[in-house]
């Protein structure tokens, strides 16, 4: 039996995000016909949509940069927070498909499985080695501490003459 995924733009794991150019001759959507941009691979909107779907807020406080991501239904073991090249914060997650019993009869499938991946280039005034992440009630919070602003080194010069 084939399970049909629902389409919801607010679901971070949905593979069916709205494409405003879908249906136009120059559209990037998988259903567009006769694209005038043959170098764009057709059908990529649904394959990449799961990676673009995770909604993440980023705010800056005097002490830190704080990232908040809604990851409902994920366990902390299914979420990864990494730093690449010392200044790129990468937040990813994957919800696996549940084991399907062959004897079960499905009436509706609204919970989806899939992956998401988001990257953020951190400003220079951060301390990536002190990043902390926590998850509570389906919300991932990543805190990136900021460095203390350097005070200028002032040297007095004696005036002669």
UniProtKB/Swiss-Prot annotation:
GO terms for molecular function: unfolded protein binding. InterPro entries: A-crystallin/Hsp20_dom, CS_dom, HSP20-like_chaperone, Small_HSP. GO terms for cellular component: cytoplasm. SUPFAM superfamilies: HSP20-like chaperones. Gene3D superfamilies: 2.60.40.790. One of its GO terms (biological process) is response to arsenic-containing substance. Keywords: Cytoplasm, Stress response. Induction: By heat shock, arsenic, azetidine-2-carboxylate, cadmium, copper, ethanol and hydrogen peroxide. It is found in: Cytoplasm. Residues 47-161 form the sHSP domain. The keyword Endoplasmic reticulum does not apply. Pfam families: HSP20. Belongs to the small heat shock protein (HSP20) family. May form oligomeric structures. PANTHER family: HEAT-SHOCK PROTEIN 20 FAMILY MEMBER (PTHR11527). This is 18.1 kDa class I heat shock protein. It comes from Oryza sativa subsp. japonica (Rice).
């Amino acid at each position: 039996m084939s399970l049909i995924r629902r389409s919801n733009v607010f679901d971070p794991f949905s593979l069916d995000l709205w494409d405003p150019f879908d249906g136009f001759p120059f559209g990037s959507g998988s259903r567009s016909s006769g694209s005038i941009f043959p170098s764009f691979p057709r059908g990529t909107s649904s394959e990449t949509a799961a990676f673009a779907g995770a909604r993440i807020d980023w705010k800056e406080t005097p002490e830190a940069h704080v990232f908040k991501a809604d990851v409902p239904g994920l366990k902390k073991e299914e979420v990864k927070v990494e730093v690449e090249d010392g200044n790129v914060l990468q937040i990813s997650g994957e919800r696996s498909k549940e084991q399907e019993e062959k004897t079960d009869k499905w009436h509706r499938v609204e919970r989806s499985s899939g992956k998401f991946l988001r990257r953020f280039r951190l400003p220079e005034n951060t301390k990536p080695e002190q990043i902390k992440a926590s998850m509570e009630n389906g919300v991932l919070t990543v805190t990136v501490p900021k460095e203390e602003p350097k005070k200028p080194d002032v040297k007095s010069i004696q005036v002669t003459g």
